[in-house]
Amino acid sequence: MGQYTASQRKNVRILLVGDAGVGKTSLILSLVSEEYPEEVPPRAEEITIPANVTPEQVPTSIVDFSAVEQSEDALAAEINKAHVVCIVYAVDDDDTLDRITSHWLPLVRAKCNPSLDGEGDAEAEAEGDTQREPIRKPIVLVGNKIDLIEYSTMDSVLAIMEDYPEIESCVECSAKSLHNISEMFYYAQKAVLHPTSPLYMMEEQELTSACKKSLVRIFKICDIDGDNLLNDYELNLFQRRCFNTPLQPQILDEVKAVIQKNVPDGIYNDAVTLKGFLFLHCLFIQRGRNETTWAVLRRFGYNDQLEMCQEYLRPPLKIPPGSSTELSHRGQQFLIAVFERYDRDGDGALSPEEHKMLFSTCPAAPWSYSTDIRKSCPINETTGWVTLHGWLCRWTLMTLIDVVKTMEYLAYLGFNVHENDSQLAAIHVTRERRIDLAKRQSSRSVYKCHVIGPKGSGKTGMCRGFLVEDMHKLIGKEFKTNVVNCINSVQVYGQEKHLILRDIDVRHALDPLQPQEVNCDVACLVYDSSNPRSFEYVARIYIKYYAESKIPVMIVGTKCDMDERRQDYLMQPSEFCDKYKLLPPHLFSLKTNKKELYTKLATMAAFPHLRQFGLMTEDPKLWLKAGLGVAAATMLGFIVLKTISAAGAHTR
């Protein structure tokens, strides 16, 4: 796929304005013909310079304005269409210089912001839009006719620049001698493609807060070993990622020397600190090398407004109907590396502070540490902190249910830069479910099980039991935090699979289930075996939603450590399962601390063609007829039979 860089503007439109007689038209004609025109028309026609003859390789349109031929409405339209406005004055005429501040700059501001003008301002106030940031069109001040004087107007122009932050640059030139003509249009191009104002505040002579924030994030991403320094290896990697060239040792030493000279704490242990890194970019901008800082920002996904580009955060991903999304091997390896970088004490778990630091390159953490990841994934049961296994489980969950969010956060964490590829390389799209059914085996490694049952049936305890080593700790526990999904891994015939238990919260027995609550890889219908009225709800759910579907179903009776009560229903649970050719009810209790239930659910999801397990358990030959492919050759069919048949036994 190749490296991704946020794209810059694909074309540039330059508008020249100024008082009559300052030489706007002459400048354009001199650029095109490379000689001074003897006869100058009132206005030059719009011209387009091809990309291959411009320094920035971007097609550029140059537009002339004449107050004699055009109206003020036409001027307003041209100002709004332009990407940059060149205000031209004559260096030998002080009146044209004075008119920059008395007329042209206020005019450009007003045309870009109609609300700054009388009526528009009242309208904006009525609509509550007074807080909107004014639009600042990039401006280049151009002093023409430098061949007529022996002094410079730069001191006067620099004073104007301090009052108008939208002024990107100023240049003195001559249409007659062709002095600085091409440079003038290059500065105009540069004002659009590599603007100064988003990066730097001229008056304060420091980086803008948005630029500083972006560069801090970039520094953290490049700090691979997490020591808050960029060593030679990290700087070289940064250089290659941003500019596709290595950093020569001599150049690197010179850069460090400049930083050391200007920022006492910019270098530490022969490595660049954050202060040194920020100073370096400030220096680039002060020396007119904006394109260097912009190249870095765009490589890390920033657009001209210093916001992360949507195409950088969310590359297009095609997911066929019936397919799901999982982390690829590269995605897992990257997340392991990120975890290990921020596990500063090396204890194999992320403390709340380490977790917060890890997501410091993101707008916010994608989940709550206390009420989400610690409740939905396996944790270190001694400290209550998130383990590497739990960390990967939470990413696996997010990738299945919200892959777009996964891609966004991979970008925030620097996947695109470290892997030199887009986040698509971190995502695996599984084959369609219909193909799994046809091949009689699932190729996926992540399955979703919907746990459905009446309130008080014990389904929440069953879901939470999936996450802990000792389920006895959950007995009598009141679950105050509502956790929708619980995820852990199980072994299915020697292969690691992730199983997500989604606790479907049903308030009333008669409430209909939504399609997204029904559709899953395996359904687990839970009733309280000690409550005579509990099974009826489960039976109705099965008949209404699953009897005619291809989704495998397991019926689970909880609280089997208590006296089993006869159910007030047409059939008892075992009779119901026989009738609908389901496995016998699996009896479950937290007190037994037995976890084969979760393995059986994952197995049923992995082999979706074996929907009617009740039939299969009666005749071993039917397992072979089911056609497990490789399983038949390796006696896997026998293992499946043995595993599933055990579901009929009571687990007390």
Curated annotation (Swiss-Prot):
Cellular compartments annotated: Mitochondrion outer membrane
Residues annotated for Ca(2+) 1 binding in this entry: 223, 225, 227, 234
EC number: 3.6.5.-
Segments in the Mitochondrial intermembrane topological domain: 642-652
Binding residues annotated for Ca(2+) 2, in chain numbering: 343, 345, 347, 354
Entry binding sites for GTP 2: 453-460, 491-495, 558-561
Pfam family, one: EF_assoc_2
Keyword entries, A-Z: Calcium, GTP-binding, Hydrolase, Membrane, Metal-binding, Mitochondrion, Mitochondrion outer membrane, Nucleotide-binding, Repeat, Transmembrane, Transmembrane helix
Membrane disposition: Single-pass type IV membrane protein
Record domain Miro: where: 9-194, 444-607
Family annotation (InterPro entries): EF-hand-dom_pair, EF_Hand_1_Ca_BS, EF_hand_assoc_1, EF_hand_assoc_2, EF_hand_dom, Miro, Miro-EF-hand_domain, MIRO_dom
PROSITE patterns: EF_HAND_1, EF_HAND_2, MIRO
Ranges facing Cytoplasmic side: 1-621
Annotated protein name in UniProt: Mitochondrial Rho GTPase
Organism: Drosophila melanogaster (Fruit fly)
Lineage: Eukaryota, Metazoa, Ecdysozoa, Arthropoda, Hexapoda
